[in-house]
């Protein structure tokens, strides 16, 4: 090893086994939602308006709008349809421009854009999702994720070979 330079291993044995330290279990740090937190957001919490709706923002971005527990929809913006629908409710039924979305966001709504997933070197244009921080099974080869591709909206497990987006959150005091 040359002085001042780190050493690297090309051994396949060390790939994917190095510990990763993050703020996931540290107070007031950014982290990824757990499986139970995704389930809570989508399925079990009580919300005054609804928990979520599929939407199409700015004429080009599909995704999911998450509504806060106490949400009042802006009176001059068309209310979304298909609230809490996990079936094939169309994204295009709820189309919002920049001005409309700004009002919804000011009222507390959050938008999760539908980013394509990856499978090895391939982009999968029919599967969208966000990883959770919860592993599935004993081997750690799979994890739970929020799946909202096609006609589905659920929290389920998938091999970590697939590449999904992550959404970082930070607890608010």
Functional labels for PLM-detected ranges:
Residues 5, 10-12, 16-173:
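C-terminal, surface-exposed recognition/capping segments
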């Amino acid at each position: 090893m040359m002085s001042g330079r780190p050493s690297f291993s090309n051994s396949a044995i060390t790939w994917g086994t190095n510990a990763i330290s993050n703020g996931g279990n540290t107070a007031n740090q950014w982290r990824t939602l757990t499986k139970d937190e995704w389930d809570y957001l989508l399925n079990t919490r009580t919300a005054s308006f609804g928990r979520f709706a599929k939407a199409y923002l700015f004429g080009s971005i599909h995704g999911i709008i998450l509504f806060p527990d106490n949400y009042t929809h802006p009176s001059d913006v068309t209310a979304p349809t298909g609230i809490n629908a996990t079936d094939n409710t169309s994204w295009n039924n709820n189309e919002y421009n920049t001005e409309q979305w700004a009002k919804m966001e000011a009222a507390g709504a959050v938008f999760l854009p539908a980013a394509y997933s990856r499978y090895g070197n391939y982009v999968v244009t029919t599967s969208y999702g966000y990883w959770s921080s919860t592993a599935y099974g004993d081997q750690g080869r799979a994890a739970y994720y929020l799946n909202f591709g096609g006609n589905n909206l659920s929290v389920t497990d998938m091999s970590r070979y697939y590449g999904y987006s992550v959404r970082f959150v930070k607890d608010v005091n």
